[in-house]
Amino acid sequence: MARSLKKGPFADEHLLKKVDAILEGKMPKKPIKTWSRRSTIFPSFIGLTFQVHNGHQHIDVYVTDDMVGHKLGEFVPTRTYSGHGAEKGKKK
């Protein structure tokens, strides 16, 4: 389901504070490590790199203008697909 328009987009407060600190020059421009896959990407995030957790490790995500409005978690898959395995030793 989509989020109600009257509520507006969501991003974790700690993530917004880190982005603002980087844009103001208070923090060095290095990747921001986050577990917040649910946060919406805002236009102020463009050009920054986030390390988004996929349940196992942090994956680097460089934000471009096409990503605005999407969630951070959309760009980091949580599951690996190894294909439908053929049975070993099966002959036709």
Swiss-Prot record:
Which UniProt key words apply to this protein? Answer: Ribonucleoprotein, Ribosomal protein, RNA-binding, rRNA-binding
Name of this chain's protein: Small ribosomal subunit protein uS19
Q: Which GO terms describe its biological process?
A: ribosomal small subunit assembly; translation
Tell me which positions the record assigns to the signal sequence: none
Family the UniProt entry places it in: Belongs to the universal ribosomal protein uS19 family.
Cellular component, GO, one term: cytoplasm
UniProt source species: Mycoplasmopsis agalactiae (strain NCTC 10123 / CIP 59.7 / PG2) (Mycoplasma agalactiae)
Role according to the record: Protein S19 forms a complex with S13 that binds strongly to the 16S ribosomal RNA.
Chain segments annotated as coiled-coil in the UniProt record: none
Q: Name one GO molecular function term.
A: rRNA binding
